C-alpha cells in the first residue's frame, strides 16, 4: 500500500479542513431564511422581556437498580433472608416536590420563583446501582441475612433540599 501526502493535518490548528470551503459555499446557496421571527428581530429573539418556560418535570429522574446473586454449593441447612428497601425513593421525591412548592410560594417575584424551581427540578436526578454476590460453599447450618437499603439516594436528595433552602434564603 502506498502512502500519499495529506494537505490537511488534524493536529495543526492553522490548517483548514478541505471540506470547510465546500460546505460554506453549499450553505450560501441553499440557506435562504424568510423568517420574520429570527432574522428581523420581530419575535422572541428581539424581545428583551421574553420568558422561556421549560417543562418542570422533565429532569426529575430516580433510578435504582439492585442485582443480588446468591450461590449455594454443596451445603445443607442454609437459611437466607434478603431485604431490599427501595420505597424511600418515592418518599424522597415527595419531599423534593414539597420543597419546590415551598419555593414557589415563598418567593414574591413569580419569574424568579419559577426559575429557581426549574433549576431545582433540573438538578433532581438520582441513580443508584447495588450489586451483591454471595457464595456459600461446603457449609452446614448457616443463616444469611442481606439488607439493601438505598441510603445514598436519600443523602443525595437531602443535599438538594439543603441547597434549595440556601437559595431561598439568598433570594429573599
Swiss-Prot record:
It is found in: Spore coat. The gene is cotX. One of its GO terms (cellular component) is spore wall. This is Spore coat protein X. Keywords: Sporulation. Its main location: other. It comes from the Bacteria. It comes from Bacillus subtilis (strain 168). The keyword Cytoplasm does not apply.
Amino acid at each position: 500500500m502506498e502512502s500519499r501526502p495529506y494537505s490537511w493535518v488534524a493536529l495543526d490548528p492553522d490548517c483548514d479542513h478541505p471540506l470547510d470551503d465546500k460546505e460554506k459555499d453549499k450553505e450560501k446557496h441553499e440557506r435562504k431564511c424568510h423568517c420574520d421571527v429570527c432574522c428581523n428581530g420581530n419575535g422572541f429573539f428581539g424581545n428583551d422581556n421574553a420568558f422561556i418556560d421549560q417543562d418542570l418535570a422533565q429532569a426529575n429522574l430516580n433510578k435504582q437498580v439492585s442485582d443480588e446473586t446468591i450461590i449455594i454449593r454443596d451445603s445443607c441447612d442454609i437459611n437466607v433472608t434478603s431485604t431490599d428497601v427501595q420505597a424511600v425513593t418515592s418518599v424522597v421525591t415527595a419531599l423534593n416536590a414539597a420543597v419546590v412548592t415551598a419555593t414557589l410560594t415563598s418567593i414574591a417575584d413569580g419569574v424568579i420563583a419559577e426559575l429557581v424551581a426549574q433549576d431545582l427540578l433540573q438538578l433532581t436526578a438520582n441513580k443508584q446501582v447495588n450489586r451483591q454476590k454471595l457464595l456459600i460453599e461446603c457449609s452446614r447450618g448457616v443463616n444469611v441475612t442481606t439488607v439493601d437499603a438505598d441510603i445514598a439516594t436519600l443523602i443525595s436528595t437531602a443535599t438538594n433540599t439543603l441547597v434549595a433552602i440556601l437559595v431561598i434564603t439568598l433570594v429573599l
